[in-house]
Structure formats: structure tokens, C-alpha cells
Amino acid sequence: MTHDNKLQVEAIKCGTVIDHIPAQIGFKLLTLFKLTATDQRITIGLNLPSGELGRKDLIKIENTFLTEQQANQLAMYAPKATVNRIDNYEVVRKLTLSLPDHIDGVLTCPNSNCISRSEPVSSSFSVKSRDGDVHLKCRYCEKEFEHQVVLQAD
């Protein structure tokens, strides 16, 4: 018995592949992290079959590389995602994500009275993990929120 494997999303020669994104999260990552703010080609796979997740999203950005800090900020939305650096069609570096200590300029504070919602300042949250739950503390209003509350505010 033979298996014919075919890529469902075209391979890239050089750039970044963000794989194992939970289904329905890919577009949110593109928007929040301003991944489309480039003139490079971006390929998106949505609801692709995945042995581990059932369904997954995938983002490929040609000739663009994420820093480890940028990659780790993705962990809030896609904790099991991997960020692969591609060179000459080969994976040359694979990052496994971990929660960063801070997330800046990406999320919106859910506190409607927070100055980050009305003043020209970038949002800033410190990330705290307690008993497996992730909490975010706003730098400006100093309120602490469960991470799901902050993610839904966007």
C-alpha cells in the first residue's frame, strides 16, 4: 500500500512558517501581530487536517523572520504552535513557544477606564502563571485579568 502525500499549502524557499495554530485562530494572529504589514507573500492554510489538533491553521511568510520574542508572544493564542525558520526549502531552526514575561503593543486592556484605551500609549501586560492558569496584569491600570478575558477584548 502506498501513500501519496501532497502539500496542502505550497512550500516556501525562505521565511517563516507558523504551524500547529488552533483552527480559527490564524486570522486573529495575522491581525493582532500585524503579520500582513509586509509586501512579502503570505500563504494561509485554514482548517487543515492535523493528527494532534484535529484541525489546524498554518501561516507562511516569505523572506520574513520572527524574533524569538515575537514568536513567544504568539503563545498566548497558540501555545502549542511552532515557528520554523526556512532557508532553501529546509527547516533550519524550530522554535517551541513559551509564554513571555511581557506582551507589549498587541492586546487591549478590558478595563474601559484604563488610559491605554483613550491615550496614545501602547498596551503593556505582564504575564503571570498561577496553578496552570495564565493571568495578565495591565501596566497602566494595574488590574489583573484571566488571559481569556483579555483575549476576548480584542
Curated annotation (Swiss-Prot):
Key words of the record: Metal-binding, Pyrimidine biosynthesis, Zinc
Source taxon at top rank: Bacteria
Ligand binding (Zn(2+)): C109, C114, C138, C141
Cofactor(s) demanded: Zn(2+)
Keyword Zinc: yes
GO cellular component terms, semicolon-separated: aspartate carbamoyltransferase complex
Biological process annotations from GO: 'de novo' pyrimidine nucleobase biosynthetic process; pyrimidine nucleotide biosynthetic process
Gene3D superfamilies reported for this sequence: Aspartate carbamoyltransferase regulatory subunit, C-terminal domain, Aspartate carbamoyltransferase regulatory subunit, N-terminal domain
Cofactor note: Binds 1 zinc ion per subunit.
Family matches, as Pfam families: PyrI (PF01948), PyrI_C (PF02748)
Record carries keyword Metal-binding: yes
GO molecular function: metal ion binding
SUPFAM superfamilies cross-referenced by the UniProt entry: Aspartate carbamoyltransferase, Regulatory-chain, C-terminal domain (SSF57825), Aspartate carbamoyltransferase, Regulatory-chain, N-terminal domain (SSF54893)
Assembly information from the UniProt record: Contains catalytic and regulatory chains.
Role description: Involved in allosteric regulation of aspartate carbamoyltransferase.
UniProt family annotation: Belongs to the PyrI family.
Protein known as: Aspartate carbamoyltransferase regulatory chain
Source species: Serratia proteamaculans (strain 568)
Organism taxonomic ancestry: Bacteria, Pseudomonadati, Pseudomonadota, Gammaproteobacteria, Enterobacterales
